[in-house]
Structure formats: structure tokens, C-alpha cells
């Protein structure tokens, strides 16, 4: 039986919120909050993959296993691919990518992503989404939207408002029920993950700054389904960070 591992990619030089992995949340750095949250799962191992010696030192101080990676990776998935190669995971194993800026991610969703990949044998990656309930979120580029087919395979991901409802120009007129927000959690088959870093980086991946588009561009399938539990958006801005701090301080 395949082992299932969690890898948390943690880059220090975030563009929108510098050093956010080390941002204080109720007395602990965010990366520690994420790590402690995922330790509630029952997977075989949990690893932090980082390009920062500072993050490595801090993470090891609270007991995490850490792999130091190069600092020139195109995406978090590329970073995880390097870590997986260094760790020697078997090709049949599954790795779940939990973003280092999601300290409130429900454990049920992590387990769901892994199980979805096990169930969908044609897919090399699985991920989750949830219905958008606020029309403003459709137009927020920080909320990635996704459309998928009747068999629950992703067709496209975008920061734009997809699908486009032709004939409606006013936000109030849009049928919001057909819009889904992508939740940034991925499960990969290790064999594919090792191959991912060798794939062509597509123009659309660069244009949208969405690593999952490399998978679709190269003809592979991403399985997707609605999440078991609602997932708060990740911490991308100072405003996001303040919201999370308030939740931990309640």
C-alpha cells in the first residue's frame, strides 16, 4: 500500500507579504501554526520544504523535519519535487501539498484530496474547490476560479472571472451558482511529481502565475471535487494576516 506524505513548501521571499512564513500569529510563526494543524492528520510523514536557512532553523526548533531546497524554483510544486527526490519517496507514494500560508486548513480536506487521487486512477494530481458565495470574490484575482467537466476533471483555472456569463455586464445580474473558488491544496502521485519539474513551463502558467496550469498544458488530468469543509482563504496580504490573527486570539 502506498504511503501518504504531507509536504509544506515554505518560501521566505513572498512578493505580496514579505517574510509571511515567519509572521507572528498569537505568539507563534505562521509556518508553525500550519505544521501544528497538519500534525492532526494520520499520514506517514510531514516535511517542510524551504529555501531559507532561517525557516529551517525555526522549524527544526519546534520539531519539524525539514528539507532545504534551491531558491530558484518556479513554483511550490517544483520545490516539493526536489524535496521528494532528496527524500527518496517511492513512485507509488502520494504527496499532499499543504500551502505554508493556510494555518486554518481543515484536516478533512487534506484527507479528502489524498483519497480523491486514490479513487481517480486517470488523474496525476487532485485538488479541491468550493462554491463562491460572494459576487465580489468572482472579480478578486487573489481568488483563483476553476471550471471542470462532468467527470470532475479540471478544464481550466484562472484569476479572471470564469466562466464568463455572456449578456450580463452588471455584477448583480450574475448567476453566482456556477462559480467555484479553487482551494490551493494538491495531492500528487510521486512518479508524476518527479516528472513535473521537467515539463514545459507554459505561457499560460506564466501569464496567470498558476503552477497547476503546467499539468493541464502538458495533457495530464487533475481530479477535483467540492471540499468537505469550507476552507478560509490563505494569507496573501496584511489584511488576510490580521483576519487570521483575530481568529487565533478569540
Swiss-Prot record:
GO terms for cellular component: cytosol. The keyword Ubl conjugation does not apply. Keywords: Cytoplasm, Lipopolysaccharide biosynthesis, Nucleotidyltransferase, Transferase. Pfam families: CTP_transf_3. Pathway: Nucleotide-sugar biosynthesis; CMP-3-deoxy-D-manno-octulosonate biosynthesis; CMP-3-deoxy-D-manno-octulosonate from 3-deoxy-D-manno-octulosonate and CTP: step 1/1; Bacterial outer membrane biogenesis; lipopolysaccharide biosynthesis. Its EC number is 2.7.7.38. GO terms for molecular function: 3-deoxy-manno-octulosonate cytidylyltransferase activity. GO terms for biological process: CMP-keto-3-deoxy-D-manno-octulosonic acid biosynthetic process; lipopolysaccharide biosynthetic process. It is found in: Cytoplasm. Signal peptide: none annotated. HAMAP family: KdsB (MF_00057). Belongs to the KdsB family. This is 3-deoxy-manno-octulosonate cytidylyltransferase. The gene is kdsB.
Amino acid at each position: 500500500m502506498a504511503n501518504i506524505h504531507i509536504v509544506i513548501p515554505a518560501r521566505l521571499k513572498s512578493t505580496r507579504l514579505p517574510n509571511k512564513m515567519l509572521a507572528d500569529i498569537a505568539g507563534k510563526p505562521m509556518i508553525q501554526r500550519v505544521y501544528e494543524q497538519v500534525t492532526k492528520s494520520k499520514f506517514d510523514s510531514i516535511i517542510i520544504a524551504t529555501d531559507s536557512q532561517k525557516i529551517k532553523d525555526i522549524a527544526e526548533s519546534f520539531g519539524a523535519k525539514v528539507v532545504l531546497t534551491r531558491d530558484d524554483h518556479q513554483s511550490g510544486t517544483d520545490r516539493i519535487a526536489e524535496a521528494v527526490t532528496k527524500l527518496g519517496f517511492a513512485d507509488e507514494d502520494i504527496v499532499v501539498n499543504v500551502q505554508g500560508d493556510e494555518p486554518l486548513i481543515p484536516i478533512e480536506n487534506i484527507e479528502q484530496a489524498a483519497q480523491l487521487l486514490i479513487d481517480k486512477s486517470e488523474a496525476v494530481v487532485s485538488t479541491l474547490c468550493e462554491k463562491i458565495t460572494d459576487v465580489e470574490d468572482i472579480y478578486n484575482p487573489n481568488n483563483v476560479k476553476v471550471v471542470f467537466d462532468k467527470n470532475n476533471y479540471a478544464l481550466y483555472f484562472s484569476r479572471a472571472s470564469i466562466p464568463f456569463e455572456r449578456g450580463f455586464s452588471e455584477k448583480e445580474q450574475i448567476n453566482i451558482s456556477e462559480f467555484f473558488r479553487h482551494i490551493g491544496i494538491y495531492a500528487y502521485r510521486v512518479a508524476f511529481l518527479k516528472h513535473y519539474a521537467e515539463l514545459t513551463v507554459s505561457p499560460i502558467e506564466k501569464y496567470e502565475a498558476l503552477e497547476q496550469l503546467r499539468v493541464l498544458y502538458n495533457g495530464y488530468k487533475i481530479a477535483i471535487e467540492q471540499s468537505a469543509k469550507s476552507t478560509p482563504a490563505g494569507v496573501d496580504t496584511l489584511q488576510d494576516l490580521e483576519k487570521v490573527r483575530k481568529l487565533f486570539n478569540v
